[in-house]
Amino acid sequence: MAWFRKDKKPRQPVRQRLEIPPDAFDKCDQCGHTDLAEKFVRNLEVCPNCDHHRRLRANEYLTILFDDGTIVEHDSDLRSADPLGFPDYPARLRKASASAGETDAILTATGMIDGLPANIGVMDFAFMGGSMGSVVGEKIARLAQRSLERKYPLLVISASGGARMQEGVLSLMQMAKVSAVLAQLGERRIPYISILTNPTTGGVSASHAMLGDAILAEPGAVIGFAGPRVIKQTLGQDLPEGFQTSEFLLEHGMVDDVVHRKDMKRVVGQLLRHMSGKPAAAGWAQG
């Protein structure tokens, strides 16, 4: 006779293990907050915990600012050559194009913002750090020329480490070329709005980025010409905390406003209507 008896209970079916896709969650690189990747996307790549503004791709920013179904891209066939015969530059261009899915570090397009036509250039940091070479300069110059011809306001969204060293002086020439055509916009009283995102540095900050009739910046964006270590070594003294952030520049009169990404389209729409003398569209007058 057995001392112990095991009750025979009906076995429960084993639940199928839930497979979570590896890209279902995302992590903020500022505060470390982990959340659903979909939540970051819905929040325009702004951390729901600390409000850190992550970098956007150029095509993503176009869809944020332009009215639905109005985007017409320009000069997508322009590609950088290798005029100086810089070692491995063609290979770097091919790698950057394959990785970023773009032909160079800027997208230019025409569309409608709050019902008003506008030309926009959006720099893409994913392509060689958003560096400004001959193609970037040419596309901005052509876009500004379109604004001159059609009297459309111009917007340029900057995200760049500066001039592209592989093109040497030809890259530096773009600063003067773009600045010259922007001066023509000023003479014709055609609005130019510059939007600074993280980072906006080097030759870009020394040219078109700081020439806007209105200069807006995203929160926490790093904006400056040289890096803090270079400046500290040159001056031989300590620098103020956060002296290259958009908030610091706002306090010292270098930018006109720091605008949250979710409010950028509304603010730009209000600026365009104010500059053009047109009344605010329905639903856009508040804020």
Per-region residue spans from a language model:
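N-terminal alpha-helical interaction blocks
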Residues: 1-16
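Long, charge-rich boundary regions
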Residues: 56-129
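Cys/His-rich microdomains that often coordinate metals
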Residues: 34-35, 53-54
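Conserved catalytic cores of soluble enzyme domains
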Residues: 158-276
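Short cysteine-rich clusters marking metal-coordination/redox-active sites
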Residues: 28-31, 47-50
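Glycine-rich anion/phosphate-binding loops
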Residues: 99-105, 130-145
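Residues immediately within or flanking Cys/His clusters that coordinate Zn2+
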Residues: 25, 44
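A structural preference for short, pocket-lining loop segments at secondary-structure junctions
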Residues: 113-123, 139-163
